[in-house]
Curated annotation (Swiss-Prot):
The keyword Nucleotidyltransferase does not apply. InterPro entries: NADH_UbQ_OxRdtase_chain4L/K (IPR001133), NUOK/Mnh_C1-like (IPR039428). This is NADH-ubiquinone oxidoreductase chain 4L. It comes from Aotus trivirgatus (Three-striped night monkey). It catalyses: a ubiquinone + NADH + 5 H(+)(in) = a ubiquinol + NAD(+) + 4 H(+)(out). GO terms for molecular function: NADH dehydrogenase (ubiquinone) activity.
Amino acid sequence: MPFIYINVLLAYFMSLLGLLIYRSHLMSSLLCLEGMMLSLFIMATLMTLNMHLTLMYMMPIVLLVFAACEAAVGLALLVLISNLYGLDYVQNLNLLQC
C-alpha cells in the first residue's frame, strides 16, 4: 500500500477519533465531519485516478457536492442553535422540542 493511502486513512481515522472525543460542541463535531469528508474525497480521487476508471470520474465531484451541502446545513444549524440557546453544546439539545 503506497504511503499516501496510509496518510489519507490516518487523516480519516484521526477525524473519526476527534469526532468521538470532541462531541460535546457542535462546531468541533462539524469540523471533524469536514475532515472526514475531505479525506474521503482525496481517497476517492486517488483511487479513481490510479485505477483509470472512466465511469467513476464523477464520483469525487458528487462527493464534494454532498460535502458542501452538509457543511451548509451544519453551519445553518449551528447559527440557529447558537442564536436560540446562546451556546453550541450538543447535550443541551433535545430533538423532541423541535
